[in-house]
Amino acid sequence: MIWHVQNENFILDSTRIFMKAFHLLLFDGSLIFPECILIFGLILLLMIDSSSDQKDIPWLYFIPSTSLVMSITALLFRWREEPMISFSGNFQTNNFNEIFQFLILLCSTLCIPLSVEYIECTEMAITEFLLFVLTATLGGMFLCGANDFITIFVAPECFSLCSYLLSGYTKKDVRSNEATMKYLLMGGASSSILVHGFSWLYGSSGGEIELQEIVNGLINTQMYNSPGISIALIFITVGIGFKLSPAPSHQWTPDVYEGVRFVREIPTSLSISEMFGFFKTPWTCRREILSPTPVVAFLSVTSKVAASASATRIFDIPFYFSSNGWHLLLEILAILSMILGNLIAITQTSMKRMLAYSSIGQIGYVIIGIIVGDSNDGYASMITYMLFYISMNLGTFACIVLFGLRTGTDNIRDYAGLYTKDPFLALSLALCLLSLGGLPPLAGFFGKLYLFWCGWQAGLYFLVLIGLLTSVVSIYYYLKIIKLLMTGRNQEITPHVRNYRRSPLRSNNSIELSMIVCVIASTIPGISMNPIIAIAQDSLF
């Protein structure tokens, strides 16, 4: 009898939970329509993979690419709508969150064609790779709109778990396994630290978990200036710092960038660029280390975009009364990142490690925008620079992936004389590097100029001066690589470039298509900055 009553209660409770979930999905589902498109793409990809023994490779690439494009379209149609909070306060939609979601979708859309040839050459499992990329993208999008501590914790964990799996995707390589283990252990530790910081805020606010309700709770409990808030600020800054990878939370970045590699005997002739079944180009893959993988390109931009969106909301809302404290912490992180990242990048011999330390320096510039905040167009300048950084960084990685597939090396010295063999690739890489360094009239120059100007207007004079000096340092090591690219002296040209197969002037493989898009986006937008700045300013909440 007791068991029967308990069973009935369980059924009633389950029914209530199901009906509440159905009610939320029915009335609030339209607010996460872009995310629902990605979920549908994931399910469709799984169904096709499980129902067919013979994999239709063009369809496997077509489904996630179409899902991402449709999700971007849905976001654009929803632009300028009124901000809304849905799912009982767990999720918020506004222009500010949506522009970061757009940036994440843009990264993923460019990274999928970037990975086509690499996956074919290394003969990795295609479906699982695409599933991990889509799921990580979904986690990043939910993180951008997260409005409570539970969602802020679960969404990045979804992203992080897929990142761990992607970084260790080449599981037969020892270096890849070592990098993944470091990434996993440090990620788990940082998540624990982040949750501990959340617990301090939860207790101090009287048991609130929504961001705005935490502020109201701190006012009601008179705890907004208590030592507990300072402790929470330190722990949360450390936890978010791992995702942003500023110094001194950067140790995992160069190891993961360099550790993602693969060594395998590959057939000498492959049909590549079959993402939509259009192009067939003969390709030769060597038994060499093919590096860096598109995984690194994906992780280098999406994690920073998602973490930046989360950091701005967490610091600006719950820590509204502790602005001086988190400003000081972020200023220290920005200075350390800009100095250490750019100085250590000079000494690197691997392109991947150089880009890893360069990205640490770049996040220092982004932090300036977070510190400036909404008052002096700080967020607008951060969004603008993020957009340019995506194109500059992915364009650089596209060039390096292409060179790695053709030569099997990523040593900086092995790029010597590339211009004599492949002027198009050398020129594309040079433009992306110059834009990363911030040379006029490229997009990177105007992005940094706008960011530094907003910082100067906000009174961050020392931070801006450090940024200017470290930008000059970054130009040095970028120009050092460009000088190698353009050299014509035979004694400096390595066998990798001597044996380089000259590509046709008009090649139609997907890596070059992605590379062209990124190179154009790294150069032309610098000429017409006003529309981009206006859109970024319009996105502020």
Swiss-Prot record:
It is a multi-pass membrane protein. One of its GO terms (molecular function) is quinone binding. It is found in: Plastid, Chloroplast thylakoid membrane. The chain crosses the membrane at residues 24-44, 57-77, 99-119, 124-144, 149-169, 183-203, 227-247, 289-309, 326-346, 354-374, 385-405, 426-446, 449-469, 515-535. Its main location: plastid. Its EC number is 7.1.1.-. GO terms for cellular component: chloroplast thylakoid membrane. InterPro entries: NADH-Q_OxRdtase_suN/2, ND/Mrp_TM, Ndh2_N. It catalyses: a plastoquinone + NADH + (n+1) H(+)(in) = a plastoquinol + NAD(+) + n H(+)(out); a plastoquinone + NADPH + (n+1) H(+)(in) = a plastoquinol + NADP(+) + n H(+)(out). Keywords: Chloroplast, Membrane, NAD, NADP, Plastid, Plastoquinone, Quinone, Thylakoid, Translocase, Transmembrane, Transmembrane helix, Transport. GO terms for biological process: ATP synthesis coupled electron transport; photosynthesis, light reaction. NDH is composed of at least 16 different subunits, 5 of which are encoded in the nucleus. Belongs to the complex I subunit 2 family. NDH shuttles electrons from NAD(P)H:plastoquinone, via FMN and iron-sulfur (Fe-S) centers, to quinones in the photosynthetic chain and possibly in a chloroplast respiratory chain. The immediate electron acceptor for the enzyme in this species is believed to be plastoquinone. Couples the redox reaction to proton translocation, and thus conserves the redox energy in a proton gradient. HAMAP family: NDH1_NuoN_1. This is NAD(P)H-quinone oxidoreductase subunit 2 A, chloroplastic. It comes from Coffea arabica.
